[in-house]
């Protein structure tokens, strides 16, 4: 069986036994997700990549602490989120760039590109105003597709707290995005 076809639990056990290739496979599986979470916290791809690398190295150093009865992905993403939060506290990084999951799949025309940039900027600004835990919860839930229970495990908070954070984040995002839609309709 090729390494990429091996279940997370088996790869994690092999990584705990010192198999770096197994750990590398796990990192590859969750790297994009981990980077998006780091970017939601930090706001730009360069800092997010650095925080993700910090988190991946910290997870490798502490692989022995991983509980094989729990999912590996949320464990790794939580470590990356903690690394991103540490980096943000140290550098006081502000969100300044676009959020990549919002990029469109098709090639848009110039007017559509401008509209998408304006929407992204409005969303970025609104996300930047949210408390960090709400921002991470709403990105994990609405962008990454995590369940409330998975987010609770990742963030180390009760599931009810996650539900509340997602609710309040969505409510906080609703007004700025509605204002953007109203502006867009007037422009049309």
Language-model regions, residue ranges each:
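Short, charged helix-capping/linker segments at alpha-helix termini
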Residues: 2, 16-25, 35-54, 188
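Amphipathic, Lys/Arg- and hydrophobic-enriched alpha-helical face
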Residues: 27-45, 62, 77, 127, ...
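Structural recognition of an alpha-helix C-terminal capping motif at a helix-to-coil junction
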Residues: 50-57, 70-82
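Helix-turn-helix DNA-binding module
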Residues: 124-128, 132-136, 140-161
């Amino acid at each position: 069986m090729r390494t990429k076809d091996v279940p997370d639990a088996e790869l994690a056990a092999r990584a705990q036994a010192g198999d770096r290739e197994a750990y590398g496979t796990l990192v590859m599986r969750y790297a994009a997700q981990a980077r998006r979470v780091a970017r939601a916290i930090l706001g730009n791809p360069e800092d997010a990549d650095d925080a993700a690398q910090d988190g991946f190295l910290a997870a490798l150093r502490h692989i022995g602490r991983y509980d094989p009865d729990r999912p590996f992905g949320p464990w790794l993403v939580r470590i990356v989120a903690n690394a991103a939060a540490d980096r943000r506290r140290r550098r006081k990084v502000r969100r300044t760039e676009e959020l990549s999951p919002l990029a469109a799949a098709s090639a848009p025309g110039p007017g559509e590109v401008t509209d998408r940039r304006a929407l992204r900027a409005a969303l970025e600004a609104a996300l930047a105003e949210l408390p960090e835990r709400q921002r991470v919860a709403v990105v994990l839930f609405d962008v990454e597709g995590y369940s409330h229970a998975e987010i609770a495990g990742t963030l180390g908070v009760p599931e009810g707290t996650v539900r509340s954070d997602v609710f309040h984040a969505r409510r906080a995002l609703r007004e700025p995005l509605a204002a953007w839609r109203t502006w867009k309709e007037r422009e049309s």
